[in-house]
Structure formats: C-alpha cells, structure tokens
Amino acid sequence: MSSFSQVRNPITGQATWQENADDYDYHQEVANAGFGDMLHDWERNQKYYAAIKKTIKRMQADGREVHVLDIGTGTGILSMMALKAGADSVTACEAFLPMANCAAKIMTANGADKIQLIRKRSTEIQIGVDMARRANLLVAELLDTELIGEGAIGIYNHAHQELLTKDALCIPARARCYAQVATSSLAKQWNGFKLMANLDGETLLRVPPQLNECKGDAALHDLQLSQLPTESFRLFSKPVEIFEFDFQQHLEPIQKQRNKVVPLQASQPGSADMVFYWWDIDLDHESEIVLSCAPFWAHPDKDKHVAGEDKPLANAIPWRDHWMQAIYYIPKPLHLSNTKETFYLSCHHDEYSLWFDAQLKEPAESIERHHCTCDLHLINPRSRIGQLNQSPRNKRYLNYLEETTTKDSQFLVLGNSCFLGLATCGLGAASVEIYDSNSLSRRLLDSFIKFNKLENVSLLEKLEDVQDHSKLTHIFAEPYFINSILPWDNFYFGTLLLSLKDKLSEGTQISPCAARIFALPMEFLDLHKIRAPVGNCEGFDLSLFDEMVKDSADKAVSSVEAQPLWEYPGRALAQPQEILRVDFANFNQELHQQGSIELIRSKECNGIALWVDWQLYSSESPKAFVTSGPSQPIEIGKFVKWDMFVRQGVHFPQTRTTNATQVEWQIDFKPFLGELNFKFDLKSI
C-alpha cells in the first residue's frame, strides 16, 4: 500500500503530491533520529559505563539491591551496561516505537533478555502496572546542547516523584552550566545587519532604527565553537559556572525557573556582544567521572590530548555532534571602557531554555526573555543573516551592479530579503521591482525603503504584478529563497526565469547567468560518523541498529544532505571538479553528466563535498563568481577552509575503503520536475 503527501519542490516552487510507502514516515524518523553519532562518542560511552560499574558496585557493597530504570533507552546500550555490571533488575523505557522494537532485538542478540522494556514515555509509567517497584538507580541521557531543551527538568522531577526511591542515585548525578563573555566581529554577523556601502565606501543603505533597537532572538545559536577561528574573537572573562542541576534531588526538585547575576571583571576593554555557553556532567555521585562539553581552550582535559598536523588542537579533544556549544547574543552589546571594569552577567532559565544579558549596574529584578521585533531574525536563519553581512560576497555583487547600472536601468529583482536589490536604487537605477513572495520579508524590505526614502522601488507579492516586462533591462538575484536548504535549491531562480522568458526583451541582462556545481572528495575527521555504522560499542553488538538505520536511510534520506562544513574539518583528497553547469538562459534543458575524479591523496574518502558557484556575468574572471564552497584555494592533503555563512552539500559513501583511487560520479538534472540526482561510487583501479 502507498500513501500520498503534499511536498513543496524547492526548485520548481510547486506543491506536488508525492507517493510514499505507508511506512515512509517511520523510515524518515528512524534515519533522522540522530542516535548514531552518540554511539560513536567513545568518551561518552566509556564514562557512562565506568560510572554504571562503579555505582552498582558501591550500592552492592552497601548491601543494597540495585534496581535500574533507563529512561529513553534508545538502542538499549545503557540498560545492557547496567545488566552486565550486575544490576538485580533493569527496566528500560522508550516511547519512539521503531527504536524500542530495535532495542528489543538488540537486547536479545546480546543475551540481555532479562531487561524489561516498556514502550512508553516515562511520564506514562505507573508503579504496580508497568513496573513492579520503584527503581533506586536511574541511568539516562536526556540532555541536549542547551542541557534542558529536551525537557530534562520535567522528566527528572516526575521520575523522582513517581518512579524512584527517596535514596535513588542518578547517572549522571548533576550538571553544571558555564558562560564566558566574548566579542567577535565574525560571530556578530550572524545576529545583526550592517549598513551597506558601495565600493568607494559611500552608504547605499542605512539601517532603520527598529533593527538597531531590536534585541534579537534569545534562542541559542548551536555550533562547534572550537572551530571558530581563535583570532576572530576576544574573551572578557574566564568561564564561570552559572547554574547547577542536581539530578539526584536529595534536597529538592529541580527548579523550573531561576535567575542568577554573576559579577565579573573585564579582562580587557571592548564591546561585550555574546556569551559562549557549554556544560559538563558528573556521571557519578562522587564527581570522579566528569564529561565536559567545553570548547578546546577551556576543556579540562586539553593537556591530555596531543595535537599535531593530522589533528589540530581544536580537534584533539573528544568530538561529539549531539552535545555542542552555543552562542547567546546579548540583547544590547555592553561597552566596557577599562580593564578590570566590573559588570554583571544576568543568567536566566525556564523549563526548556536559557537567556542572558549584561549590564554595568547590578539589575534589581529578573529580565524577561527577549524576542525579535524587527522581522530580520524571524524570517532568516543565522547563516542567512551572516550572509547578508558578508563583505567579500557583497563586493562581488556590487562590483557587477556598479559596472552595469545606468540611469536608464530598470531592474527586476528575484528572491527573499534581497537587500542588494534595494542597493541598486542608490546606484542610480531608474526603477527597481522586487518580487518577494514572503510577507514578512517584504515588510522588512519596506522598512528599509521608507527609512532610506527610496522612491523608485516597488515590492511585488506576485510575479504577475511586474509592470512592463519589455522595459526591463536587468533581472538580478543572489539568488536566495527561504525554502532552500541545499545550495542548488536556489535554482528556483531558473524556474522563475522560464515563466518570464517569452515576455522579456532580447537584450535583458540576467545575473547570475549560470551556476556550476562542484564536487570534492574529502577525508573528514569526524563528520562522517553521523552516518557511519556503529558495529560494536563497549563490547555490545549494535549491528541490528546499523541495519535498521541503513534500511531507513535508503528509503527516506536524500543521497546528499546539507551541512555547515566549516564546523567539520576535513582534508581535500583531490582538486574540485565541475560536475554540472546550468545556463539560466536555457534552464529548460535536461542535463546528464558523468565522469571520475582521481584521488591524489591516498586516504579514506568518507565524504564528497558539493557546492554551487554562481556566475554573475559572462567572464571566467574570479570576480565574476560568488561561491558557496571553499573560501580559499584548495591544497590537496590540507584542511579545507569553507564559507561560514552557507551550508554545503555532502554525500557519505555507503562503502568504506582506504584504497580507493577514484570517485566515479553521475548527475541528472530535470528542471521541469525539479530533480537533481547524484550518484557516487568509490573505485580501486
């Protein structure tokens, strides 16, 4: 049997009915559940196991039976650890049924049938109905990058009230959250909007007051903080502990809301713009087994790990992608005039999230969670906001626009939040029409139009509202569309051009005129682990989990996924190769290309990076191209420097080999269907 679901194709812009097997949603959920990279986190696994062994041994030495509850068991790995460590009984619960069913098979395969598996949320479990007794040892992994974003507070409070004995121990036993105040001209680009100037430095677009007054979005910006270039930020304080969460609750339940004011002394003058955030956990009651999520410069074990040419210092500490670090942007940057100047960091959390502020005077009351009031943060992801502020990128566009714009130019601009389109007004264009289908984006652009008193520009909700196609001299796009995820999703620009083609004058200039997709074989240090099979984990066979994930990924996951590759170091194994060129003047042509890339560096190829170069005009000069890929020339065998304000595509080969000599590739592009299909094979020749 099959079912149909309505999906929007990003390239055609059309909502179509897609036929799926009845279990498609199941496979999609399994493939994207994200258990895999946790199981590749060797430090997490080893320390959890060590804490389980130690705690059970201690409880038994005290003459206590050990009855374990594992909340959110996943593969069942923690339950099997507890059983093997000698627990008298183990109860595991898992509400995600595909994972629960897989866990049952894994437990059987590992001789752990004694574990009682409950296919419910822990908050639905009843003593005497689902469990024979209260547990006196809770093992769980309920945390995320924010620590509390997955509901850990409520789950722990309920467990202690309903499912655990009063003297129960927990693994982990407690957590501590840390903050470090910083400034970064690079990271600030993800949070605001800079004025736009021409190549001579003259202002083209001034920023409306509502953007400068907006406090931004309080939500965390999660990222691999260790990969932020050290020269791109300055620290105003040492890391400070801001909150502790006692999961064992021997004194009282975890509070759902708290605020704390931390006095700090500035280590240097400057503008305090943001808070770097992370946490650590004590896995055992005595705080002897600690797991830290700190960035490399603040990591307690950084001196124990050896850095070298093959693994930089930023990657010498244990890698994980499920628990990263985060940036919280301070609502109003605080100017610190002097070294050792005292200021106050206000820290707040509710049941699911945190937020921060910084002030020169100690605040008398709690500060409410702030939110966006200017639309910029509501409609644009962090990467897009950064892209809007990216000076080298904007200069490429402005160079083209300055050279081609005259007093007779009449522009049609296509895309969402295209401020470069507004800038053409300041360059002297006779008229500018901007087609932007998103109402919030149009409202944001309109605020710039009014504040800058632009009179020769109009915003269009529908493409049919263009006044006179025959008078258009230029069609321009970056291109960027809100629904795009992968770089080539912005080929929607070509679809829009097709609808205009018969109405345009012959001499209408189109920019970009073409797009080129490039492929680069990579040896990633860690990124490939998110799709790599686990096999054996701490002595437990998890191959059934690998089979389940592979089967679901084959059915429901695209062969290429979007990732911000600057966060995931990897070496180039060859020079990049152009695998597809799309001419927007002939966008209706179906294309099929194939070829091979010779691997110059003989290492494991565990990923293929993909990106788009946009050709602004007909020239092979580097100035004619805007890339979404590497930001510096590729050196084979060296780490690739990636554009930090866009996600690239990446394909993970299903077969792993260390002796591949080339990558064979095929690509098929069907513009009317909005299909772009890739196929890659590693070959040893």
UniProtKB/Swiss-Prot annotation:
All copies of domain SAM-dependent MTase PRMT-type, residue ranges: 14-355, 364-685
Record EC number: 2.1.1.-
Record Gene3D superfamilies: Hnrnp arginine n-methyltransferase1, Vaccinia Virus protein VP39
Enzyme class: transferase
Keywords, comma-separated and alphabetical: Methyltransferase, Repeat, S-adenosyl-L-methionine, Transferase
InterPro entries per UniProt: Arg_MeTrfase (IPR025799), MeTrfase_PRMT7 (IPR014644), PRMT_dom (IPR055135), SAM-dependent_MTases_sf (IPR029063)
Keyword S-adenosyl-L-methionine included in the entry's annotation: yes
Keyword DNA damage: no
Role of this protein: Essential arginine methyltransferase that can both catalyze the formation of omega-N monomethylarginine (MMA) and symmetrical dimethylarginine (sDMA). Specifically mediates the symmetrical dimethylation of arginine residues in the small nuclear ribonucleoproteins SmD1 and SmD3.
Family statement: Belongs to the class I-like SAM-binding methyltransferase superfamily. Protein arginine N-methyltransferase family. PRMT7 subfamily.
UniProt name for this protein: Protein arginine N-methyltransferase 7
Organism: Drosophila willistoni (Fruit fly)
